[in-house]
Amino acid sequence: MKTKTLWQTIVGALVAVALPAGAHHSFAIYDMSQNIEFEGVVETVKMRNPHMALTLVESQADGSKRTINFVEGAPANMIVRMGLNPADIAVGKTIKAIGAPRRDDPNAFFLKAIILPDGKRYSVIN
């Protein structure tokens, strides 16, 4: 009986520890069914783990500017392993990016893909 209780305690503790990690990696805050493409000038880029981040400034038809925040994407090391040179998305470069919008912020997106001016595409998630 003591062994069963010990195992139940161990399994319960492991599940409790794993739950926050699962919540952290949930995409529920994004509408992943959408793929919205933007073209703009890179304003900021953070090549970091666990998630890279990118800000684009997109010119609108009326001459105004819109800031698009890709607040979460793949880990930087994954993007580099795919062949992306960080210099290709440096501040000041013009690129295209595809994102899934956050449900609570119209200017925040999950970064699904980066498309360089030569057409080369780096898909983070389908």
State the predicted function of each range:
Residues 72-81:
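Short, structured beta-strand/loop micro-motifs enriched in basic residues and often containing a Trp
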Residues 102-125:
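OB-fold/S1-family single-stranded nucleic acid-binding modules
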Residues 40-42:
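Conserved hydrophobic positions within beta-strands
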Residues 22-36:
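Short boundary/loop segments of OB/S1/cold-shock single-stranded nucleic-acid-binding domains
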Residues 1-11:
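Bacterial N-terminal signal peptides that target proteins for export
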